[in-house]
Amino acid sequence: MNWQAVSVATKNEAIETVADILLQVGAQGVQINDHDAISVTAYYPDDEQLGETITAIQKALKHLSDIGMSVAPATITVNGIQQKDWEDNWKAYYHAERVTRHFTVVPSWETYHPNQIDELPIIMDPKLAFGTGTHETTRLMIQALENVVRGGESMIDVGTGSGVLAVAAKQLGVAHVLATDIDEMSVNVAKENLRLNPVAQDVTVVASDLLADVVISPVDLIVANILADVIERLIPQTTTLLKPGGLFLVSGIYDNIALHIEDVLRANDYTIVQKSQMGEWHGYIAQLKEKN
């Protein structure tokens, strides 16, 4: 079978939105180029349905523009790829990468030996999801976990994606992790990566629109690395599922909306205890106020 590489040129703050569109129309994974000209690439079979797929992508991009969410330039390019090249391209694109002081993200096909005694590998299969653990927002979240986890905590990972934050939390000693994502396809993606990491075998993954379908006793930590507009909707949901004094770790927040998200956090009884920034992305550690 031959494949076509479909690339969408976009901008930094729209990467995850564009990636989600490509996944929704049938991609098994995406590649993100966020170094020079920003683009997101996905692979689709070169068959009679390809035209419909590209049309669906165009419509989704136009819809975002119509509702005021800019993904410009949003130009689409298509290039033919042979089956072998498509398979090899994933492996050529991803290699083991140190992402924080303690963590290295390792593709599942690479044999990797830690260079330091305190180094913690996270095994990921990047073919399955765009959250491979190397994007700035994910680095911010893993660093936040390194800062706050003491061991034995309970945690919810909202919008788990590849499951990378759930694995990192277990590596650091979090006792109980519940991970959520929007649908069964996303849940299966996370489960595949969790199976690659023995420490995360007991992580529970469920389909839920943010926390709407989560019924659980309040936890010590809630983490979320998702789109900023979704974070705004999530914040009020966290307050009933987080223990008083518990911590909410959040990223996926671009420069131009960071101050607004800070206001939303404060309006929902959070105190911001740490702000972090990597490039144009912001991350926060916020503490839920104790009840009087």
UniProtKB/Swiss-Prot annotation:
The compartments listed are: Cytoplasm
Q: Which Pfam families match?
A: PrmA
Binding residues annotated for S-adenosyl-L-methionine, in chain numbering: 138, 159, 181, 225
Mind listing the UniProt keywords for this protein, alphabetically?
A: Cytoplasm, Methyltransferase, S-adenosyl-L-methionine, Transferase
GO (cellular component) term, any one: cytoplasm
| ATP-binding keyword on record | no
Xref: NCBIfam families:
prmA (TIGR00406)
Tell me what this protein is called: Ribosomal protein L11 methyltransferase
